[in-house]
Design a protein with these regions (language model features):
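Structural signal for interior beta-strand "rungs" in well-ordered beta-sheet cores
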Residues: 1-119
Length: 119
């Protein structure tokens, strides 16, 4: 089965959501209705899956809006994925700016993340 660690934040799994075996989830984490974490997925925390998303590989600090997919291996961090977006197999993103400066996230995106976390 999956491994769930809520020491760093709550984990909410909605009715009809599925976490496949071998997955590791660290809170805070929200998974809305009908979403699926594929086999062996690693969620490092601060992640929200909107309704009917499919997620695999590694994710950290990501908001997936409804029906968005990242169903295969690869790393995705510090991102907002819009509704109906699909990331192909082995998609990777960097969460480090190429000049090593701090990344700045707009207030709008932070508000959106809090909305999905139901704050």
């Amino acid at each position: 089965g999956p491994f769930l660690n809520s020491e760093d934040g709550p984990i909410y799994i909605a009715k009809g959501a599925e976490i496949m075996e071998g997955s590791m989830v660290r809170g805070p984490f929200v998974m809305h209705e009908g979403s699926v974490l594929k086999l062996g997925t690693k969620v490092y925390g601060a992640t929200t899956l909107g309704p009917y998303c499919k997620v695999g590989g590694e994710v950290n600090n990501v908001v997936f809006q409804g029906y968005a997919n990242k169903a295969h291996d690869g790393f995705l961090g510090n991102s907002v994925i819009g509704e109906w977006c699909n990331l192909g197999a082995d998609t990777n993103s960097s969460n480090l700016k190429n000049n090593f400066l701090i990344l700045v996230l707009s207030v709008y995106l932070i508000s959106l993340h809090l909305l999905y976390l139901n704050f």
